[in-house]
Amino acid sequence: MKRDDAWAGLLDADEKVIWQGQPDSGIKPTLSMIGNAGVGLFFAFMGLRGLFQSYSDSGPHGNSLLIFSGFGLIFAGYHVLAPGFLRRYTWYMLTDRRAFIAENVPFCGLTTTSYPITSETVIELEEGTPPSVIFASENKSFARMFFIDRGPSNSEIGFEYIADARHVLKLMRDIQKGGA
């Protein structure tokens, strides 16, 4: 997908593009990523441990334990590699009144979401390597898990892991002041 294809037909007649970019697609460790990868590696280790123990006890009857190792490794690998893979297919655009996020993940199709930038929009810089500009949030409701109601969770939305985040933050502040 070319960068401009995602934006075709989305802009108002008098709306102008002031910035376009794409996030860094490298691996960015987060607490949830480390925790989920740890759970996956635990299952992989326990499956392999059971497999080797069954071989030493009574012969090759523990091959069914390989499935636990496989699922554990897949679970860990997914949580480490998937976020960077998804960012590789993400594009950002800032106009004089809206922020757009487009994703064109293979086999999933193109999705484009816009967020208005008004004087009431809370915009913040999230430090990192590279930093992110957060400008919206979304409440996600989680189902009950293990008889515990986990309640709603707030998910931050923005231009994640962009090298020129400080410049984009300044552009967004200018939009809020009406000077874009």
Predicted regions and their residues:
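Conserved beta-hairpin
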Residues: 19, 75-116
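Short, charged cytosolic
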Residues: 1-21
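Acidic, Ser/Thr-rich low-complexity segments on the non-lumenal side of membrane proteins
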Residues: 98, 102-143
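Membrane-proximal intrinsically disordered regions of secretory-pathway and membrane-system proteins
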Residues: 11, 15-18, 110-111, 116-125, ...
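A generic secondary-structure signal marking the coil-to-beta-strand transition
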Residues: 15-17, 90, 131
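Alpha-helical transmembrane spans
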Residues: 26-91
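A membrane-cytosol interface segment of integral membrane proteins
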Residues: 127-180
